[in-house]
From Swiss-Prot:
Organism: Mus musculus (Mouse)
GO molecular function: MHC class I protein binding; peptide antigen binding
Record flagged with keyword Magnesium: no
Protein known as: H-2 class I histocompatibility antigen, K-D alpha chain
Stretch forming the signal peptide: 1-21
Membrane topology (Cytoplasmic): 329-368
Top-level taxon: Eukaryota
Region (Alpha-2) residue spans: 112-203
Subcellular location: Membrane
Chain intervals for the UniProt region annotation (Alpha-3): 204-295
Cysteine pairs bridged by disulfides in the record: C122-C185, C224-C280
Extracellular face of the membrane: 22-305
Keywords annotated in UniProt: Disulfide bond, Glycoprotein, Immunity, Membrane, MHC I, Phosphoprotein, Signal, Transmembrane, Transmembrane helix
Renumbered residue ranges of the record's region Alpha-1: 22-111
Length: 368
């Protein structure tokens, strides 16, 4: 198995998953960043249920604590938050050690800034059986080591990671991870879905429209927007006379809108005057049927254009008449001689280690 680079996973925040009948996912993303001369490495951990961030820990906070990031998590009592805070602080120490160990493996100096990351969690189906478990690590933005889909073996990305793999294989760490992913991870996902049922199991249909962006005298860009939808799983495609233009589209990753919903757009360059031949198709579970959109010059714009053109013609005629009358009058007043004029003054014109128990716990084995 080739693990996905965690920087890309973090940038994307979370791969889209469906809600209601399933599948569902629980995932944690953890990052430790060394900063020589500025104190201890910064440690950040965030947790997601499906497409929603629900917990966070930041070692740079005034009072570093595991805290809720979704209103429904406030139902958990003080004991839960205290326990998770202690686990996060324990994991913070593990990541600091791992950063130093990785620097040694790669023969790096202590003067540079480095990043160690981890993503772990589980995907479950509608029957609550495990579909996929994750334990992936990255160093300086590159894959380091990952638990394979069989949850029994590891894939090391390079010779440095081979050292860690041998150590973890000897210690039987894969078995420990597997027990968590098949058991407690699934149970905690069920718990969080119960707490956030109204939010996590909702469906917000996208609001879609097409915008027009001139490029040159021969072509334009048509951009199809989908806004305010949840969950994040959505498909936008452009078609020309019924044929998909997937290879010719510019497609951005689905992005959080900041209000619990998501947004996305897809663009295609088309010949000027051929805009009507292109259609955008939007597929989302919140829609009773897929949307089909086409760029059209709004009727109001056509009417306004006609009105403006008429007004321009009338205005030009009025101005021309006024100028002619003014000149004729001045010529009469001056006996046909021209008059010189001068302008008056001023008249110019947008975690964790090996889980155990609930969410987080210190790994029994570091990279060393």
């Amino acid at each position: 198995m080739a693990p996905c680079t965690l920087l890309l996973l973090l940038a994307a925040a979370l791969a889209p998953t469906q809600t209601r009948a399933g599948p569902h996912s629980l995932r944690y993303f953890v990052t430790a960043v060394s900063r020589p001369g500025l104190g201890e490495p910064r440690f950040i951990a965030v947790g997601y249920v499906d497409d929603t961030q629900f917990v966070r820990f930041d070692s740079d906070a005034d009072n570093p604590r595991f805290e809720p990031r979704a209103p429904w998590m406030e139902q958990e009592g003080p004991e839960y938050w205290e326990e998770q805070t202690q686990r996060a602080k324990s994991d913070e120490q593990w990541f600091r050690v791992s950063l130093r160990t990785a620097q040694r493996y790669y023969n790096q100096s202590k003067g540079g800034s480095h990043t160690f990351q981890r993503m772990f969690g589980c995907d479950v189906g509608s029957d609550w059986r495990l579909l996929r478990g994750y334990q992936q690590f990255a160093y300086d933005g590159r894959d380091y080591i990952a638990l394979n889909e069989d949850l029994k073996t590891w894939t090391a990305a390079d010779t440095a990671a081979l050292i860690t793999r041998r150590k973890w294989e000897q210690a039987g760490d894969a078995e420990y991870y597997r027990a968590y992913l098949e058991g407690e991870c699934v149970e905690w996902l069920r718990r969080y879905l119960e707490l956030g049922n109204e939010t996590l199991l909702r469906t917000d249909s996208p609001k879609a429209h097409v915008t027009y962006h001139p490029r040159s005298q021969v072509d334009v860009t048509l951009r199809c927007w989908a806004l305010g939808f949840y969950p994040a799983d959505i498909t936008l495609t452009w078609q020309l006379n019924g044929e998909d233009l997937t290879q010719d589209m510019e497609l951005v990753e689905t992005r959080p809108a900041g209000d619990g919903t998501f947004q996305k757009w897809a663009a295609v360059v088309v010949p000027l005057g051929k805009e009507q031949n292109y259609t955008c198709h939007v597929h989302h579970k919140g829609l009773p049927e897929p949307l089909t959109l086409r760029w059209k010059l709004p009727p109001s714009t056509v009417s306004n254009t006609v009105i403006i053109a008429v007004l321009v013609v009338l205005g030009a005629a009025i101005v021309t008449g006024a100028v002619v009358a003014f000149v004729m009058k001045m010529r009469r007043n001056t006996g046909g001689k021209g008059v010189n004029y001068a302008l008056a003054p001023g008249s110019q014109t947008s975690d964790l280690s090996l889980p155990d128990g609930k969410v987080m716990v210190h790994d029994p084995h570091s990279l060393a």
